[in-house]
Amino acid sequence: MPSSAKPCAPSASGAALRPVPTRRVALWQCTAALSLAWAGAAWAQGGARQVSSPTPLRFGILPFGGAVESRDRWAPLLADMGRAIGRPVVGFSVTSYESLGQALQRDEVDIAMLTAKMALDAVTQRRMRVLAQVRRHGGNSDHRAVLLVRKDGALNNLADLLGNPGRWRLARSDSRSVSGFILPQVELFLPNGISIETAFRSELVDTHQATALAVANGDADVATNNTTDLERFREQFPVEAARLQVIWTSASTPPAQIVLRRGAPPELHRRLQAFLAGYGAADGPRGDAERAVLKSLRAALGYEAEDDTALLPAAELEYQLAWQRAMNAAWVSEAAKQARLQRIEQTYARQVALLKDEGGAAAAGK
C-alpha cells in the first residue's frame, strides 16, 4: 500500500482538521483529532445539542489512485453538497479499502461512497443505510471487471493463465473490491478450481491504478481491474496503458453505493438524497459544471436515490463466493461440508430479509 507520510494540517479557513492520507499510524492520528473535534455534536450521541456553528459532515472517499487525487476530485461535489444542506462537508480521504473500513467501524465517517461489498457490510452491521447509487445504463460501456496483461508479455491469453496459475505473478485489489477480487473469483477463478489468494506465484494487493502500473512496468504478469478505472488509467498514463491488453471481461458489476450513518435525522437523509438525485440535472452553466464534476468522478449519468434493497445483487454475489469456496475446499467429512453450506444459506437468507425490511421501511417513510 502507499506509505508516504505527511502531517495532519488545518484547512485554510482553520475550521477543522482533515486527515491527509499517510502511512496508517499517521492516518489514525489525524482521524483521532477529527473525532475529538467533532464528537461533541455527533447525532449518534443522541443529543439535540445546540452549537454555534454546524458540525461538518465527514464524507469517506475510496481511493482512485492516490488519496489526495481522490479527495481533490470529490471536492467540488462536496462543496455543492454542503451548500445544499447548509452544513460543511469535509472529505475523509484514505489510502486503502482497509483504512476506510476501519473508519466506518470506528464511526469516524458520516456518509461515504463505498463498493457494493463494503456497503453490504456496513448496512448488515446496522451502521449505515443506502442513500443513492451510481446511475448506470446497459451495454458494453457498463462497469465491468477485467484482467490485464502486457501485450508483449509471456502471458497473453486466458488459457495459459488458467492452465498454470502458479507460474504467474498476480496484482489484485482488496477482497472488498467487487471488480478487483469478488467477480474474478466468482465468474472465472473458482469455477476453474483456482483460489485467487493462494494459486499464484506471488501476489500484490493495491489500488486499481497500482495494479495496472505493476503489469505495465513488468512487476506483475496479470492484474485484476475494471473498465472504469482502466479508462482513467489510459488518460493519466497513456504510455503505460498502451502496453496493456484485456484478456477477460466480466458481467456488469453492482454499482457503488453512497451510504449515510444510521440514526441520521430524517430531514438530513431526505435533503442529501434529493441533492444527489438532482446533481447534474439542471440546465445552463450550473448543470454543465455539475456534469463536468460527475464525469471526473466516472459517474457521468449521476446518482439515483436508492434504499437498502439496492444491495440485493451484492448479497447474491457474496453468497455465490462463499458457496463456491466451500465447494472447492477440502473437508474432513461430508457432514462438515453440508453444515458449512447450510450456514451459508442461512446467512444469505438473513441478509436478504434484512435488506428487504430496511428497504420497505425506507419506502414507507418517504
Task: Label each residue range with its predicted role.
Residues 47-120:
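Extracytoplasmic small-molecule ligand-binding "clamshell" domains
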Residues 66, 72, 76, 271-366:
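An extracytoplasmic/periplasmic, membrane-proximal ligand-sensing/linker region
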Residues 1-21, 25, 29-39:
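N-terminal secretory signal peptides
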Residues 54, 58-82, 94, 140-213:
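Bilobed "Venus flytrap"/periplasmic-binding protein-like clamshell domains
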Residues 98-112, 125, 143, 208-223:
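Short helices/loops that flank or line small-molecule/ion binding pockets
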Residues 55-63, 134-146, 238-273, 291-307:
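Periplasmic-binding protein-like
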Residues 116-126, 189-190, 216-217, 221-242:
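A ligand-binding cleft/hinge motif common to bilobed small-molecule-binding domains
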Residues 104-105, 161, 215-216, 258, ...:
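Hydrophobic residues within well-ordered alpha-helices
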